[in-house]
């Protein structure tokens, strides 16, 4: 296993890692790609809590680790706007960002995503925006393609089957990166660990996309390599669950209403996130023992509930000398866990 060579080594099998492999193999059908992840392949991921309702603290956590990351059990909401989800326009501009979003969306459709896109009725969007403005709330228009939890799994599995069957892509489950190898200022491989054995893989390039579960590893790695980084905002809040009747005047037109409010006293940015009409609230546990909440909804109407849930988040941007917003978020989550005795009556959600 030592000293194998791949054109690209991808650390992390979440959406970023998967799409890296899809694009590379489209550009070069002979490209040899190795994707590693600390979790299992998509067909082997099993979360006991989804059956029993009780987390047994599996290691690695089947909810956040493995092929497709946390997306395997998410409800697959694709936000088709550069106005949400990050700062991509800071790097490539509005026009190119829109083109890339459309391209990524087309790939999801190639693998079986649903045809319906919500939030395209401009007249209704304008009416809702007008009503929001009366309360100093900004509505961020954003078309949404909703796959549903069951279809999201099927789409991500189809990507897995395509890559390992039709391309020169290899997926290694239960494998971690110990160290990225750099020579002459260029990443050219990594020291990996699988089943207690360390081995070296050489690669033409390395893509590090470990997701939330690998944030600590990535932070440690870039510091060791002397890479300068900038922290994004940290969003901390609660997940709210209400009857559908309270939110359906928004969700039946937008599916997910993305709203932003700035508080009067300190002008804190407060926003809605991850809205799930007819959805369910789920419990997740990170490997550091923190219990958190998430939400999802099914595409199948028969599996819809009578409730809508969404996260209500406050954004905080830290400056020097504090430079570890993830630790801050984890600390708040731990306090929430402590106050509830580990139960999810109230829980912080870290984004």
Predicted regions located by residue number:
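Residues forming the flavin
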Residues: 2-85, 123-126, 130, 135-351
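Dinucleotide-binding Rossmann-like beta1-alpha1 core, especially the glycine-rich loop
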Residues: 58, 66-118
């Amino acid at each position: 296993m030592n000293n194998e060579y791949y054109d690209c080594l991808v650390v992390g099998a979440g959406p970023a890692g998967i799409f890296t492999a899809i694009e590379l193999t489209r550009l070069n059908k002979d490209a040899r790609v190795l994707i590693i992840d600390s979790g299992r392949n998509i067909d082997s991921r099993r979360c006991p809590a989804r059956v029993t309702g009780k987390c047994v603290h599996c290691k690695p956590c089947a909810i956040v680790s493995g092929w497709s990351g946390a997306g395997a059990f998410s409800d697959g909401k694709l936000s088709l706007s550069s106005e949400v989800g990050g700062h991509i326009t800071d790097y490539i501009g509005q026009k190119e960002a829109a083109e890339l979003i459309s391209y990524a969306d087309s790939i999801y459709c190639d693998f079986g995503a649903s045809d319906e896109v919500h939030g395209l009725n401009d007249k209704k969007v304008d009416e809702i925006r007008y009503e929001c403005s009366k309360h100093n709330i900004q509505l961020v228009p954003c078309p949404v393609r909703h796959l549903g939890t069951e279809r999201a799994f099927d789409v991500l599995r189809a990507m897995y089957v395509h890559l390992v069957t039709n391309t020169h892509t290899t997926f290694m489950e239960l494998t971690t990166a110990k160290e990225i190898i750099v020579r002459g200022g260029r990443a050219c491989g990594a020291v990996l660990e699988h089943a207690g054995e360390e081995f070296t893989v050489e690669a033409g390039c390395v893509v590090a996309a470990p997701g939330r579960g690998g944030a600590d590893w990535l932070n440690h790695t870039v510091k060791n390599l002397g890479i300068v980084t900038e922290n994004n905002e940290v969003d901390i809040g609660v997940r709210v669950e209400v009857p559908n009747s309270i939110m359906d005047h928004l969700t039946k037109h937008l599916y997910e209403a993305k709203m932003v409010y700035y508080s009067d006293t300190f002008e804190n940015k407060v926003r809605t996130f991850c809205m799930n009409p007819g959805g369910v609230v789920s419990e997740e546990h990170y490997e550091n023992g923190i219990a958190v909440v998430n939400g999802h909804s099914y595409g199948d109407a028969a599996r819809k509930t009578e409730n809508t849930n969404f996260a209500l988040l406050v954004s905080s941007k830290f400056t020097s000398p504090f430079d570890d917003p993830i630790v801050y978020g984890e600390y708040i989550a731990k306090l929430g866990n402590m106050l509830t005795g580990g139960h999810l009556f109230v829980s912080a959600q870290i984004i």
